Every structure is written in structure tokens, then in C-alpha cells.
Curated annotation (Swiss-Prot):
One of the GO BP terms on file: negative regulation of toll-like receptor signaling pathway
Lineage of the species this protein comes from: Eukaryota, Metazoa, Chordata, Craniata, Vertebrata
Protein task: Transcriptional activator. Binds to the interferon-stimulated response element (ISRE) of the MHC class I promoter. Binds the immunoglobulin lambda light chain enhancer, together with PU.1. Probably plays a role in ISRE-targeted signal transduction mechanisms specific to lymphoid cells. Involved in CD8(+) dendritic cell differentiation by forming a complex with the BATF-JUNB heterodimer in immune cells, leading to recognition of AICE sequence (5'-TGAnTCA/GAAA-3'), an immune-specific regulatory element, followed by cooperative binding of BATF and IRF4 and activation of genes.
Pfam family for this entry, one: IRF-3
Inducing or repressing factors: Not induced by interferons.
Expressed in which tissues: Lymphoid cells.
PTM annotation: Phosphorylation by ROCK2 regulates IL-17 and IL-21 production.
Quaternary state and interactors: Interacts with SPIB and DEF6. Interacts with the BATF-JUNB heterodimer. Interacts with BATF (via bZIP domain); the interaction is direct. Directly interacts with NLRP3 in the nucleus of Th2 cells; this interaction enhances IRF4 ability to bind to the IL4 promoter and is required for optimal IRF4-dependent IL4 transcription. Interacts with SPI1.
GO cellular component, one term: nucleosome
Keyword terms: Activator, Cytoplasm, DNA-binding, Nucleus, Phosphoprotein, Transcription, Transcription regulation
Protein name as it appears in the record: Interferon regulatory factor 4
Gene label: Irf4
Outcome (variant: residue 95 to R): Mice show a severe defect in antibody production both at the steady state and after immunization with different types of antigens
Organism: Mus musculus
Positions where Phosphoserine occurs in the chain: 446-447
Length: 450
């Protein structure tokens, strides 16, 4: 394929007549070898792994002529864009190439080597040898939606919330108490999901105006109790004291792993929470510092060190009276799984500089009551964090860098429930003195200086 001569259309490896006859594999190899696209390079001498620039169109330094050139070339090659006739649409060009890569059995993304949260983001792909190919890939739900023209993944539909509960969410923040965020015990038909984000991911969602002038905005949290919940049972003062002591506990038990090998285990003690990071820290706050150690010399050391290099600002975790929160400050992508994860079979990403709730105390206690009184499955209280790689990922269980986090109060109450099955726990409410600023402790971490 000659890419160096002819009109601008042939410059991008395309002609209007032959656009549908080429294959992505050979086309991409030709583009990489041409050297015309900055950042599109081979990663190894064997020319089996390559890096492809992946800058978002919303970046301030985005240059359409340069950053969208490869995506435009693919659209030209496939006949999906006609120079001088069709309106330029870089996001759609990018979507088409991404879907083609995901669908093709010629390519496999090396997620642990891709970097999407740096100033010049890129993805890394491996060209699958002919003898190692599997059947054709199936497009994921996100890919299908993107191909259909949706610029962002769409969440599954949920039934409408009861009017009273919607009213609570529409109240101004300063008029809300913690009860407005607690589970509505009278509507067991509402499944628990946290968070349920309406509209484009990473964008502020704004719903239609209501007749009373209120408008629903933001990210919603809805939860319901188990199908059957035993009424409050009087308990001995000693048990009540044990519960109260546990519920005032802000400690976190944290285990750090490299490739399933435990490299550090500790318990944090600061009421302000902790910061998980790597390398030297210059933090002057009261956060406990949880540092990933330098990896031993093994086959994955370089890959691990590369991921660790993007953890400088780290991840902040803290316990509030109502649950465990996280705020990602580092460049590295962080994915998580836990009792509040929206998806159990595909990645849940912590967005940068946004607070996310990972564990809900009220939900845990409701499930613990049912476990203790009715023998239901034990409630989940462990959160898994995965750094630099998509998680959960059923196809690739072993990850380079992970952390397991448990609120110590949850483990204590779970063990206590095991030992006192049948006469444990009353209906739990957050203390009356918990004010709105206390509830939103995330605000205390929004001004952390790095």
C-alpha cells in the first residue's frame, strides 16, 4: 500500500473506491511504519507491540490536525468521511477506530501499559500472532452504544424514585440532614446501587424542571433494606457498648499486593484518614501515609515501577460516620470493587479529584442484621483497589498492583455477629449530633495541598 503519493485522501491511505477492501491489521502496520503520526510508534524491535496516541478532544492543548489525524485517516480509509463534503467529527472518528480495535481479533490492548491520565495519553496494543488468534471479539455494551452514536456509556435504566424521596434530593444542601441521604425503609422494591449516575459520565447531570420550580441535579444514591428485616431487639448494655465503640472507629486495615504477593499490611489510626502513594511524601496534613514499597527484582519489576511512577499524589481514603470515602489525586487510573460498586463484571473507575463512596455503614448494618437473625449471606465490607489496570476483569484476574481495604469497625461487628447470632444489633441510626458538614467530610479533603 503506497501512502506517500497522490491527493490528500491517498495520503491517509484511502481512496473513495477502495475504502472497504483493506484490513485494519495491515492498515495500522503501514501507518506506524510511515512515521507520519507523532506518538504512533513501535514499542519493541519485533514490531509486535505499538503505542497509539489517545488524547481527549476536551484537553486544552488538543490539536485536531495532529491529535485526530490517525482517527481521521481511518474514517477516510473506510469511506466514513469525505473531505470537503462531510463535517469534521473527531470524536466519531476516534470511536470508529476504538470499536474496530476492540472488535478485531488481531489486536489485544495491554491495559497495564496504557496511560490515559497523563498530559500525552496513549494506549498500548499487541498484534496477536496468526496462530494465537481466538474467535471474533464481541463488542461490549459501551462499544455498541458508542457505535450507535452515544458519546458516553449509558447506565442501565432504573425505576423512578418515590415522590417523597425525590423531594428530599431536591432540597437545598443546607436544608438537608443526614436522614435525607439514608435508605428509605418503606420502599424495598428499589435495588441498591451506589453511585447511580444519570447522564454522561464525568459530566454534571441536570434533569428537567418540575412544576414546583425545583430541579434535580447531580449524582443520585438510592438504597433499600433487605427483603425482610427483624425489628429492633433489646440488647445487653455490654453489647450496646461494643457496637457503639465499633461505630466510632475510624481505623482502616490495608493490605498492599504486587501480583497477589502481600508486600505491606497495616492499620491506619488517623481520624483524618490516609493517603496511599509511592515514593517520598511531602504531605504536612494529618493523614496517615501508606506507601507502596519498591518492588523486588522480578520479571514484573519494570512494569510495576512504571505504574508506581504515576502515584505521586496518591489516593486519599477516610471513614465518615456514614461510610468509607475515597478521592483520587494521582495521574494513575484507579479501579475498584466493593459492596457499593455499580458493576461487578466490568471496571469501576475512580474519577480524578472526585469523591466516591466505597462503603455504606447503614447498608452494612442492615445486611448484618439479616445475616445474624436469618442466616443470609454475610455482608461485604472489603474494598479492592487496582492501580493502573482495569478491574474487575474476569479475563485477567491477576493484577500488578492492588490494595485491599477494610473498615475495622465492619470486621469487628461481623465477628461479633458471628459469636452472638440471634441476639445482636438493634435498628441503627447515625448519632443525632452528626451535622451536615460532618456528613460531607469529603469537603475537608478537597483543599489538600500537594
Amino acid at each position: 500500500m503506497n501512502l506517500e503519493t497522490g491527493s490528500r485522501g491517498s495520503e491517509f491511505g484511502m481512496s473513495a473506491v477502495s475504502c472497504g477492501n483493506g484490513k485494519l491489521r495491515q492498515w495500522l502496520i503501514d501507518q506506524i511504519d510511515s512515521g507520519k503520526y507523532p506518538g504512533l510508534v513501535w514499542e519493541n524491535e519485533e514490531k509486535s507491540v505499538f503505542r497509539i496516541p489517545w488524547k481527549h478532544a476536551g484537553k486544552q492543548d488538543y490539536n485536531r490536525e495532529e491529535d485526530a489525524a490517525l482517527f481521521k485517516a481511518w474514517a477516510l480509509f473506510k469511506g466514513k468521511f469525505r473531505e470537503g463534503i462531510d463535517k469534521p467529527d473527531p470524536p466519531t472518528w476516534k470511536t470508529r477506530l476504538r470499536c474496530a480495535l476492540n472488535k478485531s481479533n488481531d489486536f489485544e490492548e495491554l491495559v497495564e501499559r496504557s496511560q490515559l491520565d497523563i498530559s500525552d495519553p496513549y494506549k498500548v496494543y499487541r498484534i496477536v500472532p496468526e496462530g494465537a488468534k481466538k474467535g471474533a471479539k464481541q463488542l461490549t455494551l459501551d462499544d455498541t452504544q458508542m457505535a450507535m452514536g452515544h458519546p458516553y456509556p449509558m447506565t442501565a435504566p432504573y425505576g423512578s424514585l418515590p415522590a417523597q424521596q425525590v423531594h428530599n434530593y431536591m432540597m437545598p444542601p443546607h436544608d438537608r440532614s443526614w436522614r435525607d441521604y439514608a435508605p428509605d425503609q418503606s420502599h424495598p422494591e428499589i435495588p441498591y446501587q451506589c453511585p447511580v449516575t444519570f447522564g454522561p459520565r464525568g459530566h454534571h447531570w441536570q434533569g428537567p424542571s418540575c412544576e414546583n420550580g425545583c430541579q434535580v441535579t447531580g449524582t443520585f444514591y438510592a438504597c433499600a433494606p433487605p427483603e425482610s428485616q427483624a425489628p429492633g431487639i433489646p440488647i445487653e448494655p455490654s453489647i450496646r457498648s461494643a457496637e457503639a465503640l465499633a461505630l466510632s472507629d475510624c481505623r482502616l486495615h490495608i493490605c498492599l499486593y504486587y501480583r497477589d504477593i502481600l508486600v505491606k499490611e497495616l492499620t491506619t489510626t488517623s481520624p483524618e484518614g490516609c493517603r496511599i502513594s509511592h515514593g517520598h511524601t511531602y504531605d504536612v496534613s494529618n493523614l496517615d501515609q501508606v506507601l507502596f514499597p519498591y518492588p523486588d527484582d522480578n520479571g514484573q519489576r519494570k512494569n510495576i515501577e512504571k505504574l508506581l511512577s504515576h502515584l505521586e499524589r496518591g489516593l486519599v481514603l477516610w471513614m465518615a460516620p456514614d461510610g468509607l470515602y475515597a478521592k483520587r489525586l494521582c495521574q494513575s487510573r484507579i479501579y475498584w470493587d466493593g459492596p457499593l460498586a455499580l458493576c461487578s463484571d466490568r471496571p469501576n473507575k475512580l474519577e480524578r479529584d472526585q469523591t466516591c463512596k466505597l462503603f455504606d455503614t447503614q447498608q452494612f448494618l442492615s445486611e448484618l442484621q439479616v445475616f445474624a437473625h436469618h442466616g443470609r449471606p454475610a455482608p461485604r465490607f472489603q474494598v479492592t483497589l487496582c492501580f493502573g489496570e482495569e478491574f474487575p476483569d474476569p479475563q485477567r484476574q491477576r493484577k500488578l498492583i492492588t490494595a485491599h481495604v477494610e473498615p475495622l469497625l465492619a470486621r469487628q461487628l461481623y465477628y461479633f455477629a458471628q459469636q452472638n447470632t440471634g441476639h445482636f444489633l438493634r435498628g441503627y441510626e447515625l448519632p443525632e449530633h452528626v451535622t451536615t458538614p460532618d456528613y460531607h467530610r469529603s469537603l475537608r479533603h478537597s483543599s489538600i495541598q500537594e
